[in-house]
């Protein structure tokens, strides 16, 4: 692999995505036979990326760690610390790249973070290996509409987070304080919601969408129901660890994300 964009972590992951245009189905596939043995990682190769693609990449990197962070059960403090440090690093360096896209050090930090975020390291110890409901929800958006994966994730994540956070409150509170550095005053609910708002504000800094309409698409209610149905089928009926989602939950999240 010769890495030209820091985003999906393909250089160290066992994951891939397959799109079937007949029926507009987009599905993830994981197999260790697909994990590269060798990768060339030169941050200079990412310096010509459009700002939008850089922002999408930074968002995707964050999401790969967020998906593994918000789980119920089996979490390890050392893994949490690695994940939190990685997310803080991505946020800090993404902000640098907004104004200085050819900053070598920032490009290098983001590139290495992308590799570590999706090679399994940030999920070590979690019982189910991650939540990944946001990815499943976005895959249906990306399957039906022409949207960048990172942008789709940013558009759906806030609505997903507000829908599930009460079922995974200690993790959301911890994320808010340790990653987003929000004011810890108030109830756990207050802190968790401030954390969700803080990361949405960060997405806006990157000019990423925080709603489906901001993706430039306007799905009908029938299309929302279709996406929820396809997502449920693709997940064999349910998805998630922070909160297990079923088809009706998925529809409600899509609806809230408009």
Model-based region annotation:
Residues 172, 179-258:
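C-terminal charged capping/lid subdomain of soluble metabolic enzymes
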């Amino acid at each position: 692999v010769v890495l030209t964009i820091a985003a999906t972590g393909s250089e160290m992951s066992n994951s891939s995505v397959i799109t079937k245009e007949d029926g507009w189905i987009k599905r993830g596939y994981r197999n260790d036979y697909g994990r590269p043995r060798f990768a060339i990682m030169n941050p200079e190769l990412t310096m010509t990326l459009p700002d939008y693609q850089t922002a999408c990449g930074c968002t995707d990197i964050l999401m790969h760690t967020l998906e593994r962070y918000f789980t119920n059960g089996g979490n390890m403090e050392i893994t949490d610390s690695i994940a939190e440090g990685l997310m803080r690093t991505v946020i800090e360096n993404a902000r640098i790249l907004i104004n200085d896209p050819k900053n070598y050090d920032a490009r290098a930090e983001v590139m290495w973070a992308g590799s570590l975020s999706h090679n399994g390291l940030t999920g070590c110890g979690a019982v189910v290996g991650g939540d990944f409901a946001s990815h499943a929800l976005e895959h249906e958006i990306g399957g039906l509409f022409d949207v960048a994966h990172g942008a789709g994730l940013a558009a759906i994540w806030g609505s997903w987070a507000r829908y599930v956070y009460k079922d995974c409150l200690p993790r959301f509170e911890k994320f808010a304080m340790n990653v987003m550095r929000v004011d810890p005053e108030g109830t756990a609910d207050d802190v968790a919601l401030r954390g969700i708002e803080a990361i949405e504000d960060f997405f806006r800094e990157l000019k990423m969408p925080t709603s489906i309409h901001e993706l430039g698409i306007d799905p009908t209610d029938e299309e929302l129901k279709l996406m929820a149905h396809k997502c449920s089928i693709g997940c064999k009926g349910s998805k998630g660890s922070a909160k297990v989602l079923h088809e009706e939950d998925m529809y409600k999240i899509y609806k809230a994300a408009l």
